[in-house]
Amino acid sequence: MTNEFTGRLVHIGATEQFDTRDGRHMVSREIVLATDEQFPKTACFTLRNELAQNFSHNIGDSISLRYDFHARPNKEGTRYYNELRAWRLN
């Protein structure tokens, strides 16, 4: 299954750098896209590593991307948080 989303860029988050538990260095950035429909849909996507570092779009640009779903538990393991992680920008 291919998950695609096309929308207008409405927010560009700051680039964040961190080290994972297994010692890998990661770069992450969040972007928010909104559709131009009668009832607009808005979604926040996470860009990682090369996508985050090479992101050169501006607010208002139309972007099409492909993404995967990821879920991670909180520290207590009592609640899960979903993440939409982009893996290709068009």
PLM features: residue spans?
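Single-stranded nucleic acid-binding surfaces, predominantly the OB-fold ssDNA-binding core
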Residues: 1-90
